[in-house]
Every structure is written in C-alpha cells, then in structure tokens.
Amino acid sequence: MNQKFRSMKNLAGMAAVLSAGILAVSCSGAGNATGFDNPIAVQADSIAVDQIIKPSQWAMCNGKAVVVSESTDSVFYVYSLPDFGFLYAWGHRGGGPGEFPNYVRFVDSADGDTGALTLENYRGKTFDAFEVGDREMALKKTTSTFPDQTTFLESRPLFPGWLATKKVSGGKEYLYTRSSKDGSVRDSVMLYTLVKAEYDDKGNMRSLSRMNSPRIVARNDRVAVVYQNVVRVDFYRVSAEGKLELLKAVGEPLDEAVLERLRTMRSQSRQNGIMGYFSTGKYLYTLYLDLELDWETKYANILEKIVYVYDWDGRQVRAFDLEKPATDILVSGDDRLLYARNLQEDFDKVYVYNLEQ
C-alpha cells in the first residue's frame, strides 16, 4: 500500500518523540501507578559499550543481546551476556538479495529469549525468523504475513499455527487471532484505541492515526496486551484452536472518562505511562515512567522509573525502583539480571541490575 499511516506516538516511541516533539500519553499526576505496592529500590552497575551506534531497538536471543542500529551499514550488533561484550556485526542495508531496508524492526523483541527473533519482511510479505549464533545470524523460518491491500494491518506470529493482528474496523481497533496457514480469522477482542482513519471513495484506507494502541507480548500460549498511554495490561490465554480467553485485567479501568482524558492531554508537560516491556518464561516486566517533558528542547526529565513484574496469570509479584533513568529494558531468562538503557543518552554504557540483591 502507498497510503501514509501515522500512529500517535506514546512513551514507547520516545525516540521519535524526542526528535519530532510528538508525545501522547496519559497525565494522571505524579506518584506510583495506582493500586501498586511500594517498589524495592535496586542499585545499578554499568558496562561500557565501545561501538559507536545509535540503537533503534534491542532484543535477546540464545543468551545474547541483539541491537538494531540506525544509520550504519551493518544492521545488527550482537553482544555476549552477562558482560555485554561485543561479538560481531551482521547484516547489511541495501536493495540486493539478502540485504535489509533502512527500517528494520523485530516484531517479537519483547517476548524475551525464545530461540529466534522475527522481522517483518515487507518486500517478501513474510515474517522471517532468525537464529542468533556465536558468529552470525541465520534465517530459520518464514511465514506469510497475509497482508490486506485495502487497510493497515499490524501483525506478529504467536505460537506455531497462529498470528496476532491488530486491525481497524468500523472506527475501532481489534485484536484478531488468524491462522498462519491461510490468514483466516479465528477470534477477536476489541481494543481501547482512539482511532482516526480516512478512506478513499473505493473504501481503501488512506491514512490512520492511533492513540493508546497496545503492544502485544506473547509467551507460549499466553498473550499480554500492554497499553502504554494508560497503566493497563490484559492477560489472555490462547487455545490450540486460536480462541482468546481473558485471564485478568490489571491497572487502570479503560472507561470513557479515561479515554476522554487521553483526548485532551496530548500537549501536557507532565506525562506518565508504560514505556518498556520484556518477558521471560515466568514473568512479564513493564517499565512505568513518570516524566516532565520540555517541549522546546524535546528532553524528558524522568522523575520515576518503576519496573512492575507480573506472572502470566496477571498477578503482580514484584516491583523495582531503578536507580538510573531508563527507557528500555532486557531481562535474563533466569529473571536475575535486568539490563537498561536511556535512549536520551549516547549508547556508550548499559546499566545492569541484580534483581536478587
């Protein structure tokens, strides 16, 4: 499709926010997210990073950190863990066979270390899953994305056999489960997204603006719908037949009063919401930020940075108050170490927290 689609950025898109001056998150005042216990303060160690790169995303695979770099010939920079030692750079940007476009993003980076990382291949209309080895990355599997030429779809694989797709219909956004064999829809739930869409005279979507569109994090048969503009996570179980069963909703109620607040709070300097998220086999980690944004300089003064931890049934089990400002997190598969970075700083160090201290 050649139409231009625009998604209103929230805390999860602060990189674009700080450069473009666009921010749309809820402004419910200072203090911890409503209803949560006081977090445990944790102290940071730092590890120096010698490569001069500008990360757009990071992920974890096979015990290694994988950083997607902007504006460099090499696309992926791979680091050993827990020391964050540089191993190799892999993948080149270009238009030739086996090369990558300028925009590259893992669709499952928040799922944690599952043995592979998946890119959406817009040229080939496939999801390409890569393994991360000690010396190189390798294509493991491809799955069709089943695009729709009349509208905008945001999809990602779930466990084998199923895709999760966000799609606007009738002025509302829905989460669909679809077969990865033929793209057919099995189940759907409505999302609390504020949508503004324009269509041409043939019914094809011409533009799309979304606010409060959630991130979909998946692990085994569980799916977490993580809203960033309000502090809210919905936990689902996905059956072998692709049916969605709501297990628990935690955080703010998504009522009309909350949505109306979102409509009127786009330009406030005080902002809060969920920015980072990462999962392990046991837990989902969400990074809650309370910040003061200077619209002139595009700099965000992070006042509060709390990591809330839930099990996959939606129960909050822990909460940590990070020592250093952070905008993105990774967590080791044994739930012992948390890695954090602040995209407002140069990528010359990574902060490490021992969650067992």
PLM regions and their residue ranges:
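Beta-propeller blade signature
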Residues: 176-180, 299-315, 352-355
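A short helix->beta-strand "capping" segment at the edge of beta-propeller domains
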Residues: 31-53, 312-315
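Short, conserved, GDST-rich strand-edge loop motifs in beta-rich repeat architectures
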Residues: 286-302, 348-353
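Asp-box/WD-like beta-propeller blade repeats and closely related beta-sheet repeat scaffolds
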Residues: 123-126, 130-171, 191-196
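Beta-strand-rich domains and repeat architectures in extracellular enzymes and scaffolds
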Residues: 45-76, 282-292
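C-terminal motif of bacterial Sec signal peptides marking the signal peptidase cleavage site
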Residues: 23-26
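Structural signature of eukaryotic scaffold interfaces centered on beta-propeller domains
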Residues: 55-61, 105-113, 154-159, 205-220, ...
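Blade-loop segments of beta-propeller domains
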Residues: 85-122, 143-147, 323-327
